[in-house]
Amino acid sequence: MKKAVVLLSGGLDSTTCLALAKSQGFACYALSFSYGQRHSAELCAATRIAKHMGAADHKIVTLDIALFGGSALTDASIEVPEFKESPEIPVTYVPARNTIFLAMALGYAESIGARDIFIGASSVDYSHYPDCRPEFIESFQSLANLATKAGIEGDRFTINAPLQYLSKVQTIQLGTELGVDYGLTVSCYQANEAGEACGQCDSCTFRKRGFKSAGVDDPTRYQKCVHI
């Protein structure tokens, strides 16, 4: 069976990617990261999801949180803003996060003989993070095949970003068709330890809009003080 490394945050997009990779016949090796996030709920979700969806293995890599300063997702002194439409890159951007995650996934993939890596990056309904754009994914794939023994020998890597051009509505519709239980996922930037969402951040807003527009019941659990 073909192997794939799937970056799994515990959120809606990465879980859909895991389901899609499995539907394509891959043995999926899920890879998650502890990098000083505000809460552990998403990693708990990733663990549940990997087990529920039958991942071949699930590894959680701990990174030095000092690498990721200046982001509201890793620095409790920086407030996570409520959603607002803006072309600017918000304070929730984590410096070079996807570059680091993909580099780790690449090394893991080469070591286990996998040549496919899945990432839930999307350039639609997103917060303008530069490392979610298609040109970044294409460039990293080029790097992967220039910087590895396998790539140089012609056993090429593919960086799969199947949600790249899908709206949140389309992603939810796809996942629903694949049987994804979105009640297992946590997307909120500042969920509490029980996995209950704030309902106000960018990620919550895109998620709420997606379920509503898709006509799919939203299984998200919200904090009691939140008015939805």
UniProtKB/Swiss-Prot annotation:
GO BP terms in the entry: queuosine biosynthetic process
InterPro entries registered for this protein in UniProt: QueC (IPR018317), Rossmann-like_a/b/a_fold (IPR014729)
Cofactor(s) for this UniProt protein: Zn(2+)
This protein's record includes keyword Ligase: yes
Pfam families documented for this protein: QueC (PF06508)
Cofactor binding summary note: Binds 1 zinc ion per subunit.
Pathway(s): Purine metabolism; 7-cyano-7-deazaguanine biosynthesis
The EC number(s) this enzyme carries: 6.3.4.20
Protein keywords: ATP-binding, Ligase, Metal-binding, Nucleotide-binding, Queuosine biosynthesis, Zinc
Gene Ontology molecular function: any one: ligase activity, forming carbon-nitrogen bonds
Gene3D superfamilies listed in its UniProt record: HUPs (3.40.50.620)
HAMAP family with a match to the protein in the record: QueC (MF_01633)
Family, per entry: Belongs to the QueC family.
Function: Catalyzes the ATP-dependent conversion of 7-carboxy-7-deazaguanine (CDG) to 7-cyano-7-deazaguanine (preQ(0)).
Stated name of the protein: 7-cyano-7-deazaguanine synthase
Organism, scientific name: Legionella pneumophila subsp. pneumophila (strain Philadelphia 1 / ATCC 33152 / DSM 7513)
